[in-house]
């Protein structure tokens, strides 16, 4: 779990008071963009996962960098070679995405960042 606490408006020293406020209905809900990832395998049935921060596709145990072609809604955007790629929501843009050199996105913006991990090129940058 992250340690910056952007989603937590209470300090750990205020846990008791915070729980009481939540039980009293004194809280605010914020809608956040989420991602759904589906892993398709030749041997297993597809598995779906939901993510609040990001989805990462990496080279795994292989020692060589991997080629990635990025499409959004069947429209080609880019091809690059890298150790992996991070698809990040605005909520997750301050986590792994930021560490990989990606942009910080406003929480209420309806987009995501696609950021290469250690791209083997000087001009492979994030796509928003």
Predicted segments, located by residue:
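Short, acidic/turn-prone active-site loops that include or flank metal/cofactor-
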Residues: 1-3, 119
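Catalytic core of DAGKc-family lipid kinases
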Residues: 3-83
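Gly/Ser/Thr-rich active-site loops/lids in small-molecule metabolic enzymes
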Residues: 79-82, 87-123
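C-terminal active-site/capping subdomain that shapes the small-molecule cofactor and substrate pocket
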Residues: 128
